[in-house]
Amino acid sequence: MTRFAVLPLSVLLLVLLFLCTESLAKSEESEEYDVAVPSCCGFSSPLLIKKDQWKPIFETKFGQISTVQIGNGCGGMGPYKIHSITLEPNTILLPLLLHSDMVFFVDSGSGILNWVDEEAKSTEIRLGDVYRLRPGSVFYLQSKPVDIFLGTKLKLYAIFSNNDECLHDPCFGAYSSITDLMFGFDETILQSAFGVPEGIIELMRNRTKPPLIVSETLCTPGVANTWQLQPRLLKLFAGSADLVDNKKKKEKKEKKEKVKKAKTFNVFESEPDFESPYGRTITINRKDLKVLKGSMVGVSMVNLTQGSMMGPHWNPWACEISIVLKGAGMVRVLRSSISSNTSSECKNVRFKVEEGDIFAVPRLHPMAQMSFNNDSLVFVGFTTSAKNNEPQFLAGEDSALRMLDRQVLAASLNVSSVTIDGLLGAQKEAVILECHSCAEGEIEKLKVEIERKKIDDERKRRHDERKKEEEEAKREEEERRKREEEEEKKRWPPQQPPQEEELRERQLPMEKEWEMEGEEES
């Protein structure tokens, strides 16, 4: 019989501690060197979501919230929810508990963001600001009075994603209100949790549930422009460490009571990564904004002047979800590969984008964005990756093709090395290029594709109708044949043919005559 050595419990605990330490070290090393997590980004094909496809989830005269969802959550990433939050001047978005990682960009207006994660924090936000809030934070948002320079309304776009690998409840949205958090529990639980008389809980429960967005005067009656609500309320709901009966944490209580000021990143006050007469780009990652550390989301902004193009490029590590802030343009995305799949779902695509539209491009899909000759194109992009993403360009000074062997590249394109030298050396610009009438050419091709699709759809419709008619006729013929067979079975056994009946009738008189003649003879 084989003997098994039984390790002492202390040894097992030491082994387990070692494994956990190694895992943590690898995790920290991955974060330090920005090692990407291999997985898909929640969607596998280019997407275009038009402005009228935003789904409103809340709307009053004080503001509104609309949402769209990108992807299906494959590979443990996504789905990504994009929210558009708009507040009228002097209004408040009441406290919310975040269920997901939140990265946002301020499109217009100004206000104050207050939140609690481990501490109570606050920051002023305005047009062009980028910031991030972690899951589990409790936050609320206040809009300032009308500002003729920044805009009359506070509007921001936010992306929500789940970075953790823990189980995710599909019933959970991006956030929940403090009211739902409070009164989802019974009175007895709340009374014991807060240590207050039953009457207080009953009084609060019987109050009318307020909407998510309210006028500031409803929160602070008789007081104008009160920009700091009591942080203790947020600390209470967030489960702040100050509420824990711990001596060491009590010593830091006075420090915790202070609302710390946080710093945002403003795209309009920072030096662009690239700028030319044809446009500018700026990318914000964890190196630019410390709160992005640990997030799977980065932010970029592209401004194309009239008749310009973001040169053909692809993202080696990130998917890109972009929102058009201003103007209109065309987007071209390639989906071709060496496979023989020629279905319409795998063809290259082009589409027109306008203010308020969202377009999403998966990782490694070559793309180009173009502005029209009479309009600029400005869009903010959310990139989804655990690694810093450096776009690779097809042409220009930063062309990835320049790194390849010229003879090998010439053989790939079936041209001479001299031709390759001329091809790669002609373009002196980079990243954003002049492209006069490129967008106009793309939209004309798009119109042709739409007309061709209409013709193909009509041809397919007629073919389907004809096939349906043939199948219907075949079915009716089959039913008729079955009815005839059933009627034939009902007549069984078969009747004698009429000719035999007539013959028998003729034979009967003759038989009678023969019988009579026989009787007479006898």
From Swiss-Prot:
Residues 457-522 are annotated as: Disordered. Coiled coil: none annotated. Glycans are attached at N206, N303, N341, N374, N414. Belongs to the 7S seed storage protein family. Residues 1-25 form the signal peptide. Seed storage protein. This is Vicilin-like seed storage protein At4g36700. Residues 466-491, 501-515 have a biased composition (Basic and acidic residues). The keyword Signal applies. InterPro entries: Cupin_1, RmlC-like_jellyroll, RmlC_Cupin_sf, Seed_Storage-Functional.
